Amino acid sequence: AASDVYKRQVLTPQIELYGKTCGIFGLGAIGFAFAKMAQGFGMRVISYSRHKKTDPKYDFIEQVDFHTFLKESDVISIHAPLTPSTENTFDAEAFAKMKDGVILINTARGGLIVEEALADALRSGKVYGAGLDVMRDEPPKKDNPLFHLNNTSITAHIAWLTRASRLRAIDIAIENFKAYLNGTPTSVIN
């Protein structure tokens, strides 16, 4: 019944974000935007990224090595592309190095996480909870162990799916094409 859901939500221990450490994995445009949001909640923001950012706009973010990133983050938000060097980054070894009770968010690519290792970390309480908008297999297999855990919220790769975001994507594509035709392409990755 709805009242049971409400009672369960009220009784679930809440976590204060203020003063906690938010770790951003991948400090591109989306990771940077998320970092600003975390800062707005009064969080200390650290990041691990392949390339050190030197622009002064990144000064509020502590750029750290991967070991420090895992050890100090209370919340980890993943924003990196899936490449041969990032695939399976979040495996059993990485989860073991994290703080107890860390919260994990992945809106990037499912292949960055070893899902069985995440399921084990969630069952043990090492990871307090996970919010996943992406999975290794999409659509995911029915027997995926993450589906059977109460401390996991999974959406079907729909974070971008609002009507407004689709219209904005069309506008961005048009502007990017115009810039390309003018010899000034945007979002170039070398």
What do these predicted ranges mean?
Residues 46:
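Conserved beta-strand positions in the Rossmann-like core of class I SAM-dependent methyltransferases
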Residues 1-6:
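Short, small-residue-biased leader/transition segments that mark boundaries at the very start
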Residues 51-145:
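Rossmann-like adenosine-cofactor binding region
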Residues 35, 39, 122:
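Gly/Ala-rich phosphate-binding loop of Rossmann-like dinucleotide-binding domains
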Residues 31-32:
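N-terminal Rossmann-fold NAD(P) dinucleotide-binding loop
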Residues 11-13, 136-190:
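C-terminal helix-to-coil terminal segments
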Residues 27-28:
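Glycine-rich Rossmann-fold phosphate-binding loop(s) that bind the pyrophosphate
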